[in-house]
Amino acid sequence: MALWTRLRPLLALLALWPPPPARAFVNQHLCGSHLVEALYLVCGERGFFYTPKARREVEGPQVGALELAGGPGAGGLEGPPQKRGIVEQCCASVCSLYQLENYCN
């Protein structure tokens, strides 16, 4: 009985102790609909932008002209050009909340 009366204040203190704060967003792979949902969550009413067609149209003719002229890429040793977009940042690799915010309007 004496042990119980000694442990009661300690148990009450442990019961009232707040839990450690949880991390709201962990760096993770986000692909497809999960990536879109994360953008909606991060950007909210601001919305987000994604214009892949406009980028391809701008880069397409220049790459073809360089290959025909014997410029970089003509020999085929360099491989495909590296892409720098949200899919490469968040799906192929892990991305943070701050990287997602870069795509908000």
Swiss-Prot record:
Q: Does the keyword Zinc-finger apply?
A: no
Cellular component GO terms held in the UniProt record: extracellular space
| Localization | Secreted
Propeptide stretch(es), residue numbers: 57-82
Any idea which GO molecular function terms this record carries? Answer: hormone activity; identical protein binding; insulin receptor binding
Q: Which residues form the signal peptide?
A: 1-24
What is the disulfide pattern of this chain? 31-91, 43-104, 90-95
Q: Which UniProt keywords apply?
A: Carbohydrate metabolism, Cleavage on pair of basic residues, Disulfide bond, Glucose metabolism, Hormone, Secreted, Signal
* BP GO annotations: estradiol secretion; feeding behavior; glucose homeostasis; glucose import in response to insulin stimulus; glucose metabolic process; negative regulation of apoptotic process; negative regulation of appetite; negative regulation of lactation
Please describe the quaternary structure of this protein.
Heterodimer of a B chain and an A chain linked by two disulfide bonds.
Give the family, as the similarity comment puts it: Belongs to the insulin family.
Function of the protein = Insulin decreases blood glucose concentration. It increases cell permeability to monosaccharides, amino acids and fatty acids. It accelerates glycolysis, the pentose phosphate cycle, and glycogen synthesis in liver.
Designated name of the protein: Insulin
Q: Which organism is it from?
A: Bos taurus (Bovine)
